[in-house]
Amino acid sequence: RIVIGASLTELKNIKTDPKVDYIFKDNESGASRGLLCALDIYNKITKFDLTKGDIISGTGSIDDKGVVGSIDGVKYKLAGAVKRHAKVFIVPTDNYKEALYEKEKHNYDIEIIEADTLHNVIEKLKAR
């Protein structure tokens, strides 16, 4: 039996000033990493370090207006973040209650940040 898989991805070439080269690792794919990619790019083009030296993990799709969308598998992604000693886990608004439930259920020592828009997440990270 032969099985063939295909993945379709919409590519966009966006010109920025300053220029940003962004390389994706082979094991990184899917819409659920969109928010973290956007935050990483923001961190590269500004002088303010959003991480403040901490490990920040998270998930969430993002549209071209900066609105963060829900994802699947929050409990697994949160558990992975805790395992990697992340201090912060960013999660879409639609998944926020589930993340809080999992944090309490497993007594995770991690800050959960609710993500509705890219702008608001940036402001929350700056304020922490």
Positions of the model-derived regions?
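C-terminal recognition in membrane/secretory proteostasis and scaffolding
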Residues: 1-58, 63-75, 79-128
